[in-house]
Every structure is written in structure tokens, then in C-alpha cells.
Amino acid sequence: MEGAEGNAGQPGPAERSHRSSVSSVGARAADVLVYLADDTVVPLAVENLSSISAHELHRAVREVLQLPDMALEAFALWLVSPLLEVQLKPKHQPYKLGRQWPELLLRFTDASDDDIAMDEPSLQFRRNVFFPKRRELQVHDEEVLRLLYEEAKGNVLTARYPCDLEDCEVLGGLVCRVQLGPYQPGQPAACTVREKLDSFLPAHLCKRGHGLFAAFRGRGAKTGPCEQGLLNAYRQVKEMAGGDSERETTLGSHYRAYLLKCHELPFYGCAFFHGEVDKPTQGFLHRGGRKPVTVAISLEGVHVIDNREKHVLLGLRFQELSWDHTSPEEEEPVLWLEFDGDSEGTPVNKLLRIYSKQAELMSVLIEYCIELSQAAEPALPQESASGPQEAPSPSSAPTQRPKLRRQGSVVCSRIQHLSTIDYVEDGSGIKRVKPKRTTSFFSRQLSSSHGSYTVVQPNDNSPEQG
């Protein structure tokens, strides 16, 4: 947060730009800049910057934006840079954490000394990871809906939320409606959509060719399949009855529709972490290596996402896994995930290694999310009795999930693309031998709920190690 002037204009390794959250510092006062999801800035004149808490800054942002009390639960302050993202607790002091940023990068990232020296966090007002989707269904304030919509839209467009093309088109159609107004058959919507395609669809879905051929493509060129699908979705956006005086209400309904569609994505509202996993060995030389992944953790479970292919490699609810993290000296920290699987038809327990200096952060978050989920379970029946809008999100899952579990959906697990350690309980490993044990490989699991995770028992017909 400090030293913005010294770093201004210096490009990082990926030509990234840094945004300072302290615009001017005096002896006792400073102008703190808090960034919203749409990149707009909320300037705050703050006394005693070095000791002000995240809770106090959060309250100041809510007052400036005139947000209702629910915003205290829905949003949190984050320190964010291209290298690390940290959601602040109410008691945290953002300025002091900003001063400690290089130490945090050394501890939780593999960044080089040069990258660490140039990296600077910005203070952002973003969705609270611990805000349940069932509570989000109760939001009616249009500004709160807009902020949630802008953040979700950004995550979709940057492919942080991997989506199938069909879902991207539906979401993009809603963005067209918000930005361009109601669909009008007589207007040149196709040209507008083509010129701003990356404002409506993720970049990897709207890449076009370059060079001589692309130069001859004029405005009258035939609409591409992605553009046509987007236009069809735009045309099908349902409008609320009413005139111009109800424009705000209408926009609020489209924000809500966008968020409800995002609720179908299993990683909506997650915190994201960087890591690597082993590739399966392939070819005559048994080459393996690693692939970079993003680990998404929410109140509902854990998802491992392939950064390059932009699809899910593994998705697990907390009831389906146990976990631990290890950080031995002179070795990489590892987050271990254990789950049920099969090897050539034989039930086994699978172990996935995720190499990451953020393994400790991920393990702590998993444990806390499980604690929150268990604490919330007794309250769910009372909340659902008060009305359909307050029903918990799992009740709608059976009707929503099949839409995303289409053949080859990007949100379906691809365990075959992972290299795992397979074993049975007594240690007679199918692919790798593990020591004898009488319980799960890890003791840390969601044991108090009725989960589907089980420890595989050995049997006389188990194949030998191959």
C-alpha cells in the first residue's frame, strides 16, 4: 500500500499494473482508495491510517455507498495483487498488512525477488467467502445486487469461473441486456456485439484470427457461431412488465437472474489459491511433470481447476473427502485430498497431492468452512419455513445440477487427467504401497455429517500391485 509513486509505471512480468490504496499520506491523515468490482474507486479520508481496522473501513465504504445492513455480511475487504489475495478479518489493520506484504509473498508464493519488490496490493470491497448462497437469495437491494453481479461477471469473463459455451451465452445475453438495454430487432445489435464481444464472453471463446485474412473481414461479415449464440440469448432475455420508471427494478431483476445462473456453478463464491498437481505419466518415456491449477474453496467443497484448459479436474463436497497438509523441511508444502474412486473396477481410496506454498491457508479454510457448515445445519429448517426465497440452496440442487452435468461439461471432474496415489485400507497398494492403517489416511474429515466418503476395505480378490 505504501510506495505507490515509486512503483508507478513499472510493468510487472505480465505487464500488470499496480493500484495503490493510499493516494496521499500526511502526518496523521490519508486518502484511502477502496476498489469495487467494476474498478470504480471509493476514496476515504482516514485519520490514524496505521491503526484503523478493516471493520472501520468497511463501515465507511457502506456509508459512502449507502448500502443496507446486509452488506456487512455480504462483503469483506480484501488485499489483492496478482500474486496473492487475502480476505481480511474485521480486526485486521490493512495498513500494517500492506507493510508486511513482502513477507506474506515470501511465505505464501513462489514469486521471485524482483516480482515481490514490484508487487503492491490494492484494497478491494468484494464478496465475502463465508456469505452463503442461500442468504444471497434474500438480497433485494439493487446496489448490493449490482456489486455482486459485477464481481461474478468479472470472474466469468476472466474464466475464473469455467463455464460451458451454452452457459456463457446465457450469461452474456444478460450482460448485453444490462449494458445495451432491451433487445430491439431493428437495431444493429450484431455489430455492437461483434465489436465488444470480449465484454460479453470469456476471451478464450471469442478469439479471432489475425493477419491478412482478418484485415479483410468487414462489418458486413457473417456472424460467427459464438456471436449468433450470444445474440439468440440476448433476444430471449425476459423483460418485466413496466415502463421507463421501473428501469431500476428491471435492472435488479437481471442482476438477480445473472447471479442465480452463477449459483449453478459449483465454485461460485469461492476463494482461489495457486498450486500444481502431477500429470499422469504418458508415452514410452513415461513423461509426467506438473500442471498449474487453481484450487477453489467454498462453504460447500473444493474444486481443482486446470488453468490452461479452463475446466474442472476434481470437484468434491466436504462429505466426500478428508484432507491434510504437510510442509516438511526442505520440501514443498502439499495439500492432500483423499476421496473415493476405483481402479479398473476395484474400489480404492485416492490421494491427490497439490503442491502449493498456500497449502496451509487452504487447509485452514477447509476446516473453517466445515465448522461453519456444521454450525448452520440446525438453523436451516427454521429459515426455509419462512418462505420460498429463504430456502437453502441445496434444495434446488437436484433440478439445477443436471443442466451443468451435460456430456463433457467443464464443471465435471476429470480424474483421468490427474495422477493420484491409489490404495486400500490394509496398505496393499494397487499402484503404490502405503503403510498399514485402520482408519482413513487422514483423520481430518467431515465425520459428524452423513457423508458418502468411506474407507475402502481390503478383500481377497484385490489385485496385486502392478
Swiss-Prot record:
Give its localization: Cytoplasm, Cytosol; Cell membrane
**Cellular component terms (Gene Ontology):** centriolar satellite; cytosol; nucleoplasm; plasma membrane
Q: Where is the composition biased (Polar residues)?
A: 383-399
Chain positions with Phosphoserine modification: 24, 384, 409, 440, 447
Keywords for this protein: Acetylation, Cell membrane, Cytoplasm, Membrane, Phosphoprotein
Its gene name is: Frmd8
Segments forming domain FERM: 30-377
Can you name this protein?
Answer: FERM domain-containing protein 8
- Pfam families in the record: FERM_M, KRIT1_FRMD8_FERM_C
Q: Which residues carry this modification: Phosphothreonine?
A: 420
Q: Which organism is it from?
A: Rattus norvegicus
The PTM N-acetylmethionine maps to 1
